[in-house]
């Protein structure tokens, strides 16, 4: 009986080692960065396509677009409201990076919304977005071969319940970045928000601006599904 129990224990131990080895091999196939440490996030990423320093290609589950995803970020998915998808025309996700800070752990958030919008009303949507967030509609605008991009950034803070906005980058580095990207060949649009809560230094503002603009420029809509 003891010999039988010992045999069973040896078999169990061997199986555990084998399973652990297989798991280790599977995990080693992924890049050693936070984005791939999360099993949900990695489902969207191409591990073989590091598109630039610090970014991997993210492919939407709608099949409508790809975007550069920062390797130090992970998608939030603790509840059904943090990642939302409706057929192939709407998707909303939020990703965060946790950094150590002398004030404690704080989060930087990146949120991306895919939806559809009438191109004829683009100026109305753009004004509503930027005026609603910053109290002014004066975004930068540029174009790529296939997209129109609007961008602005400012420092937002509250005094009591009243929100204040500082647009002057020399007075304070922005902590809120917003982008609006419209596909030239369809009615697809993407709105992006970046909440840079950890940014307390004016000289870091330019770095974050360049980082966010890289993400805006990286968006590629799926032209096979385009329809106006």
PLM region spans:
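N-terminal targeting sequences that direct proteins away from the cytosol to non-cytosolic compartments
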Residues: 2-93, 194-228
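Short, exposed beta-strand/loop patches in secreted or surface proteins that constitute
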Residues: 47-49, 57-58, 74, 82-84, ...
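Ser/Thr- (and often Asn-) enriched beta-sheet segments in non-cytosolic proteins
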Residues: 57-59, 66-68, 74, 111-115, ...
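Second-shell loop/turn segments in exported
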Residues: 59, 111-117, 163-168, 198-206
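Short, solvent-exposed coil/turn segments at beta-strand boundaries
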Residues: 68-74, 102-104, 150-153, 181-189, ...
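A short acidic-to-branched-hydrophobic micro-motif
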Residues: 91-127
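Solvent-exposed, acidic/flexible segments
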Residues: 119-123, 171-174, 201-212
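Signature of long, low-cysteine stretches enriched in small and polar/charged residues
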Residues: 124-185
